[in-house]
Amino acid sequence: MNKKILNFIKKKNKTKIISLTAYSKNIASIIDRHCDLVLVGDSLGSVLYSFSSTKKVTLDMMIEHSKSVRMGVKKSLMVVDMPHNTYRNSKEALSNAKKIISKTKCDAIKLEGGKKVIQIIKTLIKNKIPVMGHLGVLPQSATNFKFKGKEIAERKIILRDSKLLEDAGVFSIVLECVESSLAKEITKTVKVPTIGIGASVHCDGQVLVTDDLIGLNKIKARFVKRYSNIEKQINDAALKFKKDVIRSKFPTKKHSY
C-alpha cells in the first residue's frame, strides 16, 4: 500500500475527510485545494450526459474524464469509479482496472458491492491496485434509491459486508443512503475510513457531487445541501453578455486586435 493511501487511512478518528466529485480539470483544480479525496464518479452519466442511470456509463467515458481530472488534482487522493459491467469477474476487473490506472494515473479505483465482489477485490489488491468499497444504495444495480438499514436483516447484511470489505483489504468504504445508527456502528467497527453520502454525520468523512453542492442540478436529494447558486451566476453572466453584444458594447477596443 503506497504512502498516499496510508496517510489517508490515518485520518480516521483524527480529522473529518473531505471529498467531492470532478469530471474536468477546471473543477478538479478548484476543489483539490480543499479536498482529501477527489472522486471521478460514474455519476457523470446523469450529471453530464443526462443518462437515467449510471448503467450507460462506459469505461472510455471514465478514462477520458479522469485524464482531464488528473491534470487538475495535485494534492488530493484521486479515485475513479469502475463503471457498470466492467468488473463482472476477477479477470475482467483486473484488466479494466489496470487500464484505468495506466491511462489516468489515478491513485485508486472504487467499485460497488459486498459479498458478491469480495473475490474480485482480493484479486485487484493482490495485484497492487488500491480499492475503495461502496455499500448501501448501489446505483449501478439499484431498483430504487430508498435508504438502507431500516430492516434488521438488511442491517446485518450491510454490517457483515463492511467487515468483509475491510478483511479483503479496501482502504476506505463509501456508505450511501445508510441509516444513521448503522453508519455509526460501521464507522466504529471497521478500521478504515467511512465516507458518507446521505449516511449521517457519524462517518469519518463526507462526499457530495460537486454539481449538487454548487446548485447546477435541478433535482435535489434529501442529503444534499447547496452551498452556492452557480446556475444563477452563469445565467446572469450570459444575460449581461447578450445585452452587451446587442448594444454593441462588446467587444470594445480593449478586446479587439
Curated annotation (Swiss-Prot):
Gene: panB
TM region(s), chain numbering: none
Cofactor: Mg(2+)
Family membership: Belongs to the PanB family.
Residues of the active site: 176
Co-factor binding details: Binds 1 Mg(2+) ion per subunit.
Record's catalysed reaction(s): 3-methyl-2-oxobutanoate + (6R)-5,10-methylene-5,6,7,8-tetrahydrofolate + H2O = 2-dehydropantoate + (6S)-5,6,7,8-tetrahydrofolate
Positions contributing to 3-methyl-2-oxobutanoate binding: 42-43, 81, 110
Enzyme Commission no: 2.1.2.11
GO MF, one annotated term: magnesium ion binding
Residues annotated as binding Mg(2+): 42, 81, 112
Subcellular location: Cytoplasm
Gene3D superfamilies named among the record's database cross-references: Phosphoenolpyruvate-binding domains
Record-level GO cellular component terms: cytoplasm
Gene Ontology biological-process entries: pantothenate biosynthetic process
Protein name per UniProt: 3-methyl-2-oxobutanoate hydroxymethyltransferase
Keyword entries, A-Z: Cytoplasm, Magnesium, Metal-binding, Pantothenate biosynthesis, Transferase
Annotated pathway: Cofactor biosynthesis; (R)-pantothenate biosynthesis; (R)-pantoate from 3-methyl-2-oxobutanoate: step 1/2
Function: Catalyzes the reversible reaction in which hydroxymethyl group from 5,10-methylenetetrahydrofolate is transferred onto alpha-ketoisovalerate to form ketopantoate.
